[in-house]
Amino acid sequence: MLTYKEAGVNIEEGYRSVKLIKEYAKKTMSEYVLNGLGSFAGMIELPEGYKKPVLVSGTDGVGTKLDIACKKRKFDTVGIDCVAMCVNDILCHGAKPLFFLDYIACGKLEAEVSSDLVKGVAEGCIKSQCSLIGGETAEMPGMYKEGDYDIAGFAVGIVDKDKIINGKDIKSGDKLIGIASSGVHSNGYSLIRKVFKNLDEDFNGKAIWEELLTPTKIYVKPVLSLLEKFNIKGMAHVTGGGFYENLPRMLSKEGLSIVINKNSYEIPEIFKKLMELGVKEEEMYNTFNMGIGFVLCVEEDEVEEVLKELSKQGEKAFEIGYINAGGEGVCIK
């Protein structure tokens, strides 16, 4: 008689995976979590101190960056990417991350690999000050090839209703501050994999695949600190679509546009390398973060103090542009 295991689903390996994963998830639990992993659902109570609490949610994945991780069997950092992609998005509206859920899919489950993936997720949650309260691991033979994995995440945060950041107060003359990225982050990898045929080629003394698997930076701690001290009018997480698609998302009014000075900071070597290998500059700004992973909009008279505060927190940040009256979209000059 045919069994589930013979059909390609190993329940025992699933149990072993859960046992390994639980140890990492435990390290992320806050005082607000009401139950541990293993229940049908995760439960968390809302923190006190919010007058009109609003829940802010986001979901994302890591895209084809995972293809490099799968080829090089290096899975312990892409979980950080997954968390970063979600929490940086909800952060744009002023939300403090509360909890996170993950979803892992594969063709054949290997407990050590799923454990490495969740190890990264847990590390990302700790960096984001949120709890990993649940998830799902799906073994799907026939849907995925053996050795292939995918990961997605779901983040929920909280913000007071009157502190939601939605760009409504942004005006002409406001300045834009860019916080440095850690590298390519998690977007543009379908293009990258076409450009870099040999993942083992040297890049500044290490294999290019090592550079490409550098985890996406999580901006939660420095940005939440800024929100307590300054009037941050708008924020943008520079992800898929680069500058052209993401920066206008912080604007809620028509009649405003964004001007970026591309010479205001040094573009990292990895992006210069991509341009050397044939990717046009406009395509670069339309695909990648170009060294700036997160952008803040502030009043002109707060620029210097915001930059000082970010420097104190160990972040590289630059005044990269301004809000312009008239026009639309983004002008990079």
UniProtKB/Swiss-Prot annotation:
Keywords: ATP-binding, Cytoplasm, Ligase, Nucleotide-binding, Purine biosynthesis. Pathway: Purine metabolism; IMP biosynthesis via de novo pathway; 5-amino-1-(5-phospho-D-ribosyl)imidazole from N(2)-formyl-N(1)-(5-phospho-D-ribosyl)glycinamide: step 2/2. GO terms for molecular function: ATP binding; phosphoribosylamine-glycine ligase activity; phosphoribosylformylglycinamidine cyclo-ligase activity. It comes from the Bacteria. GO terms for cellular component: cytosol. The keyword Calcium does not apply. Pfam families: AIRS, AIRS_C. This is Phosphoribosylformylglycinamidine cyclo-ligase. It comes from Clostridium perfringens (strain 13 / Type A).
